[in-house]
């Protein structure tokens, strides 16, 4: 599995590039980082890759996932997961039911789905948390649940939009290592948007620096 961007940029309604077009490849199991000044378009880049781009923008360039061009595919067809700053768990559902949302509809019967969720909880060191509710969990525990939910969907690539920004330093380190280990174990290409050099150092992968453009698209 690999994720490849060629002359990739995002263009606004005025026909301007938000950032200088980028070219890079993320191999399977590799964590790449994208950095740049605040407001340059890191989150917009991730939304464009994941298929969540606002209608105020359009894509220029090519996006290839596992040798298949997905530039203009619908979200569901891309099989690209994304994690945000906030875990975005459903407060009215148990932890187990939150995780089950990540499973594809055709995956197993009720018993098999329950087993997959419990295995995910074990991997996240959250055994016996199935019937807990999100509001009873710490920030780090909620982040782990959100990650495992994304992984249960079996994404072919994973996008991370500053998922550690609200965690303290110790928890940030722990969660970062857990997330990177899970991605490498599953051989998923990962792109992390961050403003922290320590994240890029820990990722030890390609570093993409977004540069403001706001020039007419070619």
Q: Model segments located where?
A:
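ABC ATPase NBD coupling module
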Residues: 68-84, 105
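Short coil-to-helix segment of the ABC ATPase nucleotide-binding domain corresponding to the Q-loop/switch region
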Residues: 93-102
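Conserved ABC ATPase "signature" region
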Residues: 111-129, 180-181
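Conserved ABC ATPase signature
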Residues: 133-137, 141
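Hydrophobic anchor residue at the start of the ABC signature
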Residues: 147
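A short, proline-enriched helix->beta-strand linker immediately N-terminal to the Walker B motif
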Residues: 152-156
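Catalytic Walker B motif of ABC-type/P-loop ATPase nucleotide-binding domains
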Residues: 158-162
């Amino acid at each position: 599995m690999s994720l490849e961007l060629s002359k990739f940029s995002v263009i606004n309604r005025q026909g301007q590039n938000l950032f200088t077009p980028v070219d890079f490849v993320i191999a399977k199991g590799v964590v790449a980082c994208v950095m740049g000044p605040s407001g340059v378009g890191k989150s917009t880049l991730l939304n464009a890759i994941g298929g969540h781009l606002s209608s105020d923008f359009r894509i220029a360039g090519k996006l290839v996932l596992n040798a298949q061009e997905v530039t203009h595919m619908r979200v569901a067809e891309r099989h690209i997961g994304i994690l945000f700053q906030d875990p975005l768990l459903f407060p009215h559902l148990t932890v187990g039911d939150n995780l089950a949302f990540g499973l594809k509809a055709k995956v197993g019967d009720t018993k098999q789905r329950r087993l997959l969720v419990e295995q995910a909880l074990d991997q996240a060191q959250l055994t016996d948390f199935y019937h807990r509710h999100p509001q009873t969990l710490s920030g780090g525990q909620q982040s782990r649940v959100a990650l495992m939910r994304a992984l249960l969907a079996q994404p072919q690539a994973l996008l991370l939009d500053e998922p550690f920004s609200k965690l303290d330093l110790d928890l940030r380190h722990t969660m970062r290592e857990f997330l990177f280990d899970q991605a490498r174990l599953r051989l998923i290409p990962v792109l992390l948007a961050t403003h922290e050099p320590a994240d890029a150092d820990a990722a030890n992968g390609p570093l993409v620096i977004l540069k403001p453009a706001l020039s007419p698209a070619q």
